[in-house]
Design a protein with these regions (language model features):
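N-terminal lobe of the biotin/lipoate ligase/transferase fold
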Residues: 2-146
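Catalytic beta-strand/loop module used to bind and position nucleotide/cofactor moieties
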Residues: 3-6, 10-11, 17, 21, ...
């Protein structure tokens, strides 16, 4: 299924016979794999033995994003098992702030190992590598990232890791310790934010999406804004910790204390 998804992930028409030949599978096997992808929520159209994966929104432009986020390296994938897993596996080749960005992940997960639903090109899904002084509280780090996202998106935060819009979950944050090396805690921070979900999407809790704020929202613009705000807040946190200004902004953006 993952090989078929990779073939379809450029969202260009694919001829049935070409897919069978490239993947070395039979007609029945192709039909079974297509059915599994559709069951996973992917919108795959079929006409005259031609298949097309239809994205929820236009695919991201990794070159434009890399330019905007320089000097950090952006590792873009149309599909991957997990962005957190990618950062963890590549940690020895990354520098602080490098990130992995994906249109669709097949094994995404949230807090406590919960599966993270991931429509194709309907969210912002990314993870980045960060390193901090072990004397800094990890709880504080999660608060800082949550506030930065809420500031960038004009939304609310709910401790410990939820981003809310109109009282419904818009996104989440997952912070994991990779190792304690060279006097630093090396971390991977994973973030998922709903931008536009298909009407048929089934989620077990009330959810929100950024198209509620702006039906014409641009994912690239929002992604860059969110990441830049996160890195700015993290730099401030490393210098000043949780100070009075931060606490006031946290209260202002807290779902239960803000306006």
């Amino acid at each position: 299924m993952s090989s078929l998804l990779e073939c379809l992930s450029d969202c260009q028409p694919k001829v049935r016979s070409d897919l069978m030949s490239f993947l070395n599978i039979t007609s029945n096997e192709l039909a079974q794999e297509m059915a599994l992808l559709r069951e996973a929520g992917l919108n795959i159209r079929e006409e005259n033995e031609v298949y097309l994966l239809v994205p929820e929104m236009p695919l991201l432009n990794p070159q434009a994003i890399s330019t905007a986020l320089s000097p950090y390296s952006v590792h873009y994938h149309r599909t991957i098992s997990s962005t957190n897993e990618f950062i963890t596996n590549q940690i020895n080749h990354l520098k602080k702030g490098d990130l992995c960005l994906v249109e669709y992940q097949t094994a995404g997960r949230g807090r406590r190992g919960r599966q993270w639903l991931s429509p194709f090109a309907g969210q912002l899904i990314f993870s980045f590598y960060w390193a901090i002084d072990p004397k800094k509280a990890l709880d504080g780090l999660s608060l800082v990232i949550g506030l930065a996202i809420a500031e960038a998106l004009n939304t609310k935060v709910k401790w410990p890791n939820d981003i809310l819009l109109s009282g419904r979950k818009l996104g989440g944050i997952l912070v994991e310790i990779i190792n304690h090396k060279n006097g630093l805690l090396n971390l991977v921070v994973g973030i998922g934010i709903n931008v536009k979900l298909a009407q048929s999407t089934e989620i077990s809790q009330p959810y929100a999406q950024l198209t509620e704020q702006d039906p014409d929202i641009d994912r690239e613009t929002i992604l860059i804004k969110v990441i830049q705000r996160i890195y700015s807040r993290l730099a401030q946190f490393e210098e000043k910790g949780i100070d009075e200004e931060f606490m006031q902004q946290w209260i202002n953006h807290n779902e239960f204390f803000g306006d």
